[in-house]
């Protein structure tokens, strides 16, 4: 039996923020990346929502901490909004989710992603960091009521962010497709997400803004997919490494994905289906899987992303020093529960050795 549920209303296209008027907000709290403090977007959102009062929280940082979420929660409890809007990347959306969740207050929650990667606008996940460890918070109450995918927000994305976020989409889609919780519907969404990234991400990276909405939508589809099916070892290790070294999450996924695919060879028939669906060919499963892995490596190179932790600026000596902590954090990460092969310490150490690189 397959159960599929998505409560989030998704509005997509140019000028989509006008949909805020549906909410009839009176007291609007905006949780946003600091960048937006210097723009007119907060006031535009207030106008679009016809809100009487606006409060802002611009203190979001990459890898939001438990302490930051607690500070934001106090703002929710003090201001008592009827509507909370999260604007920004995955960190802003995750921080806002935690603020709403821990405040215990009933609000309308809207997510407006300004990057194309995390899919947090449609997931029941939020990632908070404490003492160098990333902790996934998973609860259906974290699902936004509305997600707004506005093409106008994508025009000025920096190339590095397009690249990092694009590999986050790929990791979400690939891992959800082979996850133990996957079903026909989640796999269809994941497969379309993979194909869209291979088809459009290089163009977006090269500066073609007309295709960016399609990549944006792919991130949302992959987010819905993994919210239903779960993720896997790539994300477990990415969380562990990110907590230690503060490398962008998508960049870590780009480094890890090919090695994790090898470790998950028991899922090769599913990887092969993905490869064929993305137009990568391969009549035999082994050929299709190789084509998919090589396509990931080629795309990583085309987007100027590192292939090892060493290339990402982390010396092998630092990795060796933190290995035990990384392995423990990865194996205790909830994402391991839906990996197609139950990960063990030997597997994680082997992958870590593969991706460390030469100093």
Model-derived regions: residue spans:
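ATP/NTP phosphate-donor binding region
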Residues: 1-83, 309-310
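Gly/Pro-rich interdomain helix-loop hinge
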Residues: 244-321, 358
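Short, amphipathic C-terminal "tail helix"
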Residues: 318-359
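Carboxylate- and glycine-rich phosphate/diphosphate-binding segment that chelates Mg2+/Mn2+
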Residues: 123-229
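Glycine/threonine-rich beta-strand-loop-alpha-helix active-site module
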Residues: 67-153
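Short glycine/serine/threonine-rich phosphate/pyrophosphate-binding segments
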Residues: 14, 20, 38-41, 66, ...
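Glycine-rich phosphate/pyrophosphate-binding beta-alpha loops
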Residues: 117, 220-253, 333-338
């Amino acid at each position: 039996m397959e159960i599929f549920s998505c409560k989030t209303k998704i509005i997509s296209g140019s000028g989509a923020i006008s949909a805020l008027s549906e909410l009839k907000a009176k007291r609007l709290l905006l949780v946003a990346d600091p960048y937006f403090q210097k723009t007119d977007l907060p006031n535009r959102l207030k106008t679009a929502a016809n809100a009487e009062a606006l409060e802002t929280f611009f203190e979001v940082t990459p890898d939001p901490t438990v302490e930051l979420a607690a500070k934001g929660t106090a703002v929710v409890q003090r201001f008592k909004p009827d509507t909370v809007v999260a604007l920004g990347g995955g960190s802003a959306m995750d921080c806002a989710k935690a603020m709403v969740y821990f405040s215990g207050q009933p609000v309308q929650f809207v997510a407006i992603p300004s990057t194309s990667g995390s899919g947090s606008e449609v997931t029941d996940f939020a990632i908070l960091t404490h003492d160098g460890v990333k902790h996934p918070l998973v609860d259906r109450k974290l699902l936004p009521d509305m997600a707004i995918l506005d093409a106008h927000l994508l025009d000025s994305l920096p190339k590095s962010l397009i690249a990092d976020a694009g590999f986050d989409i790929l990791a979400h889609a690939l891992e959800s497709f082979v996850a133990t919780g996957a079903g026909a519907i989640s796999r269809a969404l994941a497969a379309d997400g993979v194909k869209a990234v291979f088809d459009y991400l290089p163009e977006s990276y090269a500066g073609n803004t007309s295709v960016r909405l399609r990549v944006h939508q792919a991130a949302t589809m992959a987010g819905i997919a993994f919210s239903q099916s779960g993720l896997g070892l790539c994300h477990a290790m990415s969380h562990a490494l990110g907590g230690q070294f503060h490398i962008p999450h998508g960049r870590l996924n780009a480094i890890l994905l090919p090695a994790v695919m090898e470790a998950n060879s028991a899922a090769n028939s599913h990887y092969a289906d993905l490869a064929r669906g993305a137009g990568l060919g391969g009549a035999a499963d082994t050929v299709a899987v190789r084509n998919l892995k090589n396509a990931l490596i080629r795309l990583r190179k085309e987007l100027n992303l590192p292939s090892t932790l060493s290339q990402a600026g982390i010396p092998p000596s630092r990795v060796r020093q933190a290995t035990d902590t990384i392995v423990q954090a990865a194996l205790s990460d909830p994402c391991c529960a839906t990996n197609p092969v139950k990960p063990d310490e030997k597997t994680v150490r082997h992958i870590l050795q593969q991706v460390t690189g030469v100093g």
